[in-house]
Amino acid sequence: MVEPQEGKTRFHDFNLAPSLMHAIHDLGFPYCTPIQAQVLGFTLRGQDAIGRAQTGTGKTAAFLISIITQLLQTPPPKERYMGEPRALIIAPTRELVVQIAKDAAALTKYTGLNVMTFVGGMDFDKQLKQLEARFCDILVATPGRLLDFNQRGEVHLDMVEVMVLDEADRMLDMGFIPQVRQIIRQTPHKGERQTLLFSATFTDDVMNLAKQWTVDPAIVEIEPENVASDTVEQHVYAVAGSDKYKLLYNLVAQNNWERVMVFANRKDEVRRIEERLTKDGISAAQMSGDVPQHKRIRTLEGFREGKIRVLVATDVAGRGIHIDGISHVINFTLPEDPDDYVHRIGRTGRAGASGTSISFAGEDDAFALPPIEELLGRKITCEMPPAELLKPVPRKH
């Protein structure tokens, strides 16, 4: 039994099903994160909700707990086809879908509910086989692949009781909204299904979509600044472009860091950094749009298991990565969009753990620092790296 603690909400307090509580206990979650405490208060009553939260706040578990509770409380329809999911989660990237499905599998472990995923870049027939083998309770998918299955008549969305749209702002940016509209038209009307929408930002466009797709939603906002700065110690090193690689190598090698994410702005830069680290004896891998899907999933598993110490990524690939235990994020180049900075450093210091971000500001990217400071609402001290961090990289014989 979890002891009551002032200012904290326990999962016990929501009277969840024992099979779900068993899984929550296994995962070691005694108390809700702020977004979980707020969102579940509304969604467990069946209300629609719009949540503004960055990744790392526990929003995935919030909507999954809500879905699982709804499905356990309501018996499945007597007549249903294999390809008729009862809950649908749409997310913009393959990595995010895989991560949500992994969390869903952990939370449904003792419930008898089935979780399935549809993502592009993976074998269509293999995904079809899982659909034909058993009933689908929770379907997690990217919009394009879901439409493929829907248009071929393999998936029917008329039984969807709960629909979740995750990273809605990102779906807008990536041009997925027309596909999402087509999908939503196949589901029951908005008053007949529960709809939850999550976004890192509440732009006018996002709010317009929310209005169209939800009924009288609860609006929950978790300030991104807290996510960005409270648990992450932020540093900036002023360093010449030609010294950046030396600094990166020495930071990782001298400190024996185990799980580090390095961000760069361009795919060719990501490739170059990864190749040099590997050549210099540090186990590294890259994540960018050029890396095929099966390799991405293998890479993420290797990173999660500690076989890969350094993961080098672009912003698009990096945003879908949600792995606990990343101790350091290094910005090899500062992003031009300040929001990307917040997303990058949000890979560490997740779910209350502490983390460190180190940014390299060189002659080519120091201009990006003031807008980042403006977004954070504070200055980040710019320091010179100590001499031992600029030592030449030892030659491998």
Curated annotation (Swiss-Prot):
A motif (Q motif) lies at residues 9-37. The keyword RNA-binding applies. It catalyses: ATP + H2O = ADP + phosphate + H(+). A motif (DEAD box) lies at residues 166-169. GO terms for molecular function: ATP binding; ATP hydrolysis activity; RNA binding; RNA helicase activity. CDD domains: DEADc, SF2_C_DEAD. One of its GO terms (cellular component) is cytosol. Its EC number is 3.6.4.13. It is an enzyme of class 3 (hydrolase). Component of the RNA degradosome, which is a multiprotein complex involved in RNA processing and mRNA degradation. DEAD-box RNA helicase involved in RNA degradation. Has RNA-dependent ATPase activity and unwinds double-stranded RNA. Belongs to the DEAD box helicase family. RhlB subfamily. This is ATP-dependent RNA helicase RhlB.
